[in-house]
A protein has these predicted regions:
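N-terminal pro-sequences and low-complexity stem/linker regions of secreted or lumenal proteins
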Residues: 2-438
Length: 438
């Protein structure tokens, strides 16, 4: 048939052309012992990295370039620039399922359009209903069965008593006793999520989240108990559009960028750095502007074993990133999709370079707030930002576009492309040429 999946892929991935730190067979050893998986929200490649000349970007579509995201630009340049990475999902409802399970169930895929079109369904896609779960669960369930230590920072975690959408006000409540209560409905996350790390809530700064993550990370450095696998959710690059009085889209994205930079700096200066890999992606791309495809997105791999100052244009996906992490941890694939996906071999080498990363300070004012007369302010006030992606994606994207480019600017329509991959007689994948910027 036409499917790239075979049962043999459950035990071993397609072999790379050269040996790297990523094992081929499930269970084979890797010099990487700790994986940190950072999940962000909703940006396309061109929106953030379209201004990097080394990659296949379109600067005309770049909204959050190097002045807004200096850390993501530095990480792409100092480590690996991935300019052909695609998210598997359409929106956050299926995006967090794909990002944690390499699959979204039939229930999720058939019901999220009803929820997103505001026709009466609740958002029950991140652990609140068992029917939305894959049969064998998410990546933490696989870790639990394999005896891999793991911890979630905000992913599939809820918050009980901080009102979302307040534009930073909730930060002031976090340190008040007894403080907000976090919870999870996931059985295998009970006792495995941080009780001090705030989950998704746009009223809480990503810098606060990283402060809380750093508190635990430094404690792990002292006691030697760093989990083998961590999931860290930094989602404020979602933004609240131009809702008056809250951070502008540029400020939200810049805050998120600084938080990521500080996390990477801490890891690369720690005793765990020689055997750690950090993987970063967006859960979905929110149907945003990109000259190749609306699913093309930013992603980063950061490790002593990643190549340095290297452009990797291999076609990768959410499932391929998961497959790479699974191979490092000795986990089997979770679905036919990560089983058949291309692992990120080409981004890695088998020789370590331990040069640490130094975070870049923000270049714009992180306290910049939307004025009452910002383009789309009224519609932004009417949109629901309590859950990620609850706002209509095209309209929300247009508001973000106009907030950066001006009220009279026109956002281009989303691009859809077809992709074909063939496998030659030596079992190596070849990609049909993709769209290049003119």
């Amino acid at each position: 048939g036409n499917s790239p999946y075979t049962d043999e892929l459950l035990k071993a991935a397609h072999a790379p052309r050269e040996k790297t730190a990523i094992p081929v067979r499930v269970g084979d050893p890797s010099p990487i012992k700790h994986v940190i998986y950072v999940i962000k929200e909703n940006r396309t490649y061109d929106q953030v990295l379209g201004d990097i000349s080394e990659g296949n970007g379109d600067p005309d579509l770049c909204l959050f370039g190097e002045d807004v995201t200096p850390n993501q630009h530095a990480l792409a340049r100092e480590f690996v620039l991935l300019d052909n990475f695609y998210v598997d999902a359409e929106v956050s409802a299926d995006g967090h399922n794909w990002s944690m399970g390499a699959y979204a169930t039939d229930y999720v895929e058939k019901t999220w359009p009803t929820n997103y079109s505001r026709r009466g369904r609740t958002y029950d896609y991140e652990g609140s209903k068992k029917i939305s779960r894959p049969t064998r669960g998410y990546i933490w369930d696989y870790c639990a069965r394999a005896g891999i230590t793991y911890r979630s920072y905000g992913e599939f975690v809820g918050i009980k008593d901080v009102k979302p959408g307040g534009g930073g006000d909730a930060d002031q409540n976090l340190d008040r006793a007894p403080g907000p209560e976090y919870f999870t409905s996931e059985e295998n996350l009970q006792g495995h999520f941080s009780p001090i790390f705030p989950p998704y809530n746009l009223a809480i700064s990503d810098l606060t989240r990283v402060d809380r993550w750093l508190d635990e990370f430094h404690e792990f450095e002292k006691n030697g108990r760093l989990p083998q696998f961590q999931i860290v959710r930094l989602g404020n690059n979602h933004t609240q559009g131009t809702r008056p009085g809250v951070p502008t889209p540029r400020a939200y994205v810049a805050e998120n960028d600084l938080a990521l930079g500080r996390l990477v700096e801490a890891v690369t200066n720690s005793k765990y750095w020689p055997e750690t890999a950090i993987f970063v992606l967006e859960d979905d791309a929110q149907n945003g502007p990109d000259h190749v495809d609306a699913h093309r997105s930013i992603a980063f791999v950061i490790s002593p074993y990643t190549k340095r100052r290297f452009v990797d244009s291999t076609m990768y996906s959410t499932s391929g990133m998961l497959r790479t992490m699974e191979l490092i941890l000795g986990l089997p694939p979770m679905s036919q999709y990560d089983a058949a996906a291309t692992p990120m071999y080409n981004s890695f080498t088998n020789k370590a370079e331990l040069t640490p990363y130094k975070h870049r300070p923000a270049r714009i004012d992180l306290a910049e707030k939307n004025p009452a007369n910002a383009p789309g302010a009224l519609r932004s006030m009417q949109m629901n930002f309590e859950k990620e992606d609850a706002a209509p994606d095209v309209e929300f994207n247009e508001i973000i576009w106009k907030s950066v480019r001006g009220a009279d600017s026109q956002m281009p329509a989303p691009v859809r492309s077809a992709f074909v991959k063939v496998i030659d007689d030596d079992d190596h994948e070849k990609e049909i040429p993709r769209k290049k910027r003119k």
